[in-house]
Amino acid sequence: MAEGFAANRQWIGPEEAEELLDFDIATQMNEEGPLNPGINPFRVPGITETEKQDYCNMLQPKLQALRNEIQEVKLEEGNAGKFRRARFLRYSDETILSLIHLFIGYCTYLLNRKELGSLRHDIDIEAPQEECYSSREQSITDNIKYGKRCFIGTAGLYLLLFIGVGIYLGTAKAQVVWRLPPLVVPVEESEIIFWDCWAPEEPACQDFLGAMIHLKASTNISIQEGPTLGNWAKEIWGTLFKKATRQCRRGRIWKRWNETITGPLGCANNTCYNISVIVPDYQCYLDRVDTWLQGKVNVSLCLTGGKILYNKYTKQLSYCTDPLQIPLISYTFGPNQTCMWDTSQIQDPEIPKCGWWNQIAYYNSCRWESTDVKFHCQRTQSQPGLWLRAISSWKQRNRWEWRPDFESEKAKVSLQCNSTKNLTFAMRSSGDYGEVTGAWIEFGCHRNKSKLHTEARFRIRCRWNVGDNTSLIDTCGETQNVSGANPVDCTMYANRMYNCSLQNGFTMKVDDLIMHFNMTKAVEMYDIAGNWSCTSDLPPTWGYMNCNCTNSSSTNSVKMACPKNQGILRNWYNPVAGLRQSLEKYQVVKQPDYLVVPGEVMEYKPRRKRAAIHVMLALATVLSMAGAGTGATAIGMVTQYHQVLATHQETIEKVTEALKINNLRLVTLEHQVLVIGLKVEAMEKFLYTAFAMQELGCNQNQFFCKVPPELWKRYNMTINQTIWNHGNITLGEWYNQTKELQQKFYEIIMNIEQNNVQVKKGLQQLQEWEDWVGWIGNIPQYLKGLLGGILGIGIGVLLLILCLPTLVDCIRNCISKVLGYTVIAMPEIGDEEETVQMELRKNGRQCGMSEKEEE
């Protein structure tokens, strides 16, 4: 019997109370009884001596009754099995506690487990014997069931931990492909750009994504020099001209030129070639043609296909240029355009030449000068026609109006115009394609709306001093007897009326074709009958090219001398060269499809929701413009990259939801077209390398993908860690210093796309293996979350135990219920005869001994 019980048989101490409560619990159990019919408070883990004394005081009446019951109890045949089962459950509980503490890493419990929640001395056993329990005695208790699960779970946890560590160590040095990085670089000279125009006033350009013109942002990024939009000026001009005239109808042949090209021996031996040049005639409407030709339409050029414009002056990135007034034909008055007068320095034939050297007159020191000159024109009715009755308002009643006969060949739309300044023009200059006789000038004229006439614009040509001899070329100057030249006065004096006419056609060379555009019908539809006037509408920023004229000392033959000391060049403005000059400030850049960076980028990449494909808008505009311009290092850019993704994702979702609610069809049209266009553009980027990136393990929503080690080792894609410097380098510097690395990855993509035999075979094997074990690659991510959760819960429980003593009793009860804590029940026996038998019961049945023999 315990020492405390022997000292005072009336007062029941903690040790005797513990055994009495064990007996009380054991009597409630059967062979297949519940695992935990009750909890012995004296066996709660961590109970103190003071708490045991308090329990004794509270439970003293109950304990006295249990002691009396034990003295009267009869040891029945079934009691031995109950005691053996209680003892088995006690040790099974200790096993479960060991597994749980092993699971949470509390290994010191394994060393001190016999001191926790048990008597200071265990049940006395004279000689340790091997205990054996039948399966009926063990049964399938909750402890056994959960113990097996806990053991399997613990083993699986550590197995996954080892696998995860192995995978992490195996991929720690992997290299990562950063898809669509926040970076812009110059395009190559050989790259093809796709562009279109946007002009709100012109239907020919309204089919483009007009809203893209507003997608721009300032940046302090410095981009390496590369091709500008001016490199494609000729192609852009040709396309714009076709857009301006695309609604023109082709009619009959306007002119046919027959020429003979002789061979090196003349026409001997049939070496002559007869060439016939056919100039077709196109009928056009003035409102769709003339405004474009004179640069009256504000046109923005926008890039597609992932290309972006970088304004070298304003440091802005945008999809479109600022609105430009682009004249499509040669003009005397035009925007500021640099021209060269020294022919020895002219390499590009499209650059306008500012002087001539085949005359004695030598034009040099050409300069562009702005001007405020105005041309005023008025028309007086003088053509044959008929009086027609016109219906007027009720006040004026009906009246008769004069309508000229436009179908008559004698009908000619003539005007009288004057200039506000004296204009002296240079020697010879061509007008369109085909010589214009006499002194001449062309300009645009605007007519305001009135009661009898609508608002309109016309192209007017004024000619004076037209020579009678068509074989001679009218040349500005006063020198007589010049071979092949007819001297004319090319000065247009201020406030002097000159005979002018509406220009009803013009000839242009587009690409390799010469075309004549007939606008006779367009002129008729603008109601030119009657008396009206117009004023030139030259933009205030336009001017002309003024050159100094000096006479050379050459006197070999009679040549035309300078009429004045200065001369204005007619049709000096070259539309292609002018367009090139306007577009030189726009550098064409692109966002790389991918950037190879070290694997450590994945360490400081925040966990965020994957973005949808239309969030490429943020990558191509907001991020590339604002983010890349901060000059931040690669480490900071990764975080900012995902912040922009998340922010823009939320913005797009909110805008789309608002549009659905309000059902603003007209307002949302441009937005929908913009989003569709950007989706297509982003999909093109993904589809271009879709197969290759998929084989590398990247899906369409992933922006960081690891390159398989066998690939970057095979292609020797070694990253210079010194240059990377743990991410303390800007992405622009990294791209410039690792171009060879990016090129090698491009070779990998191309090899995969071209179904390289070796790569294809390896990828097939990799695909078969990945179908089975592909989920292993995500284990480290899962383990991080699982391990972090377990550690967090463990630390939280530990803090509660240490910092909240008032909740200790509640926590004990909860732990006992969760762990299924069970105690043993051993009754006290007073007779010596029964002592031996009880020792057998306490020790359990020996192997090979029946219950009756044991009793």
UniProtKB/Swiss-Prot annotation:
Transmembrane keyword on record: yes
CDD domains: HIV-1-like_HR1-HR2
GO-annotated cellular components: host cell plasma membrane; membrane; viral envelope; virion membrane
Swiss-Prot/TrEMBL GO biological process terms: symbiont entry into host cell; virion attachment to host cell
Origin species: Feline immunodeficiency virus (strain UK8) (FIV)
Gene: env
Taxonomic superkingdom: Viruses
Subunit organization: The mature envelope protein (Env) consists of a trimer of SU-TM heterodimers attached by noncovalent interactions or by a labile interchain disulfide bond.
TM annotation in the entry: 785-805
PTM text: Specific enzymatic cleavages in vivo yield mature proteins. Envelope glycoproteins are synthesized as an inactive precursor that is N-glycosylated and processed likely by host cell furin or by a furin-like protease in the Golgi to yield the mature SU and TM proteins. The cleavage site between SU and TM requires the minimal sequence [KR]-X-[KR]-R.
Positions of region (Immunosuppression): 661-679
Positions in the Extracellular compartment: 1-784
Marked site (Cleavage) residue numbers: R610, A611
Protein known as: Envelope glycoprotein gp150
Glycan attachment residues as annotated in the record: 220, 258, 269, 274, 298, 336, 418, 422, 448, 469, 481, 499, 518, 531, 548, 551, 716, 720, 728, 736
Role: The surface protein (SU) attaches the virus to the host cell by binding to its receptor. This interaction triggers the refolding of the transmembrane protein (TM) and is thought to activate its fusogenic potential by unmasking its fusion peptide. Fusion occurs at the host cell plasma membrane.
UniProt region (Fusion peptide), positions on chain: 615-635
A molecular function (GO) term: structural molecule activity
Residue ranges annotated as Cytoplasmic topological domain: 806-855
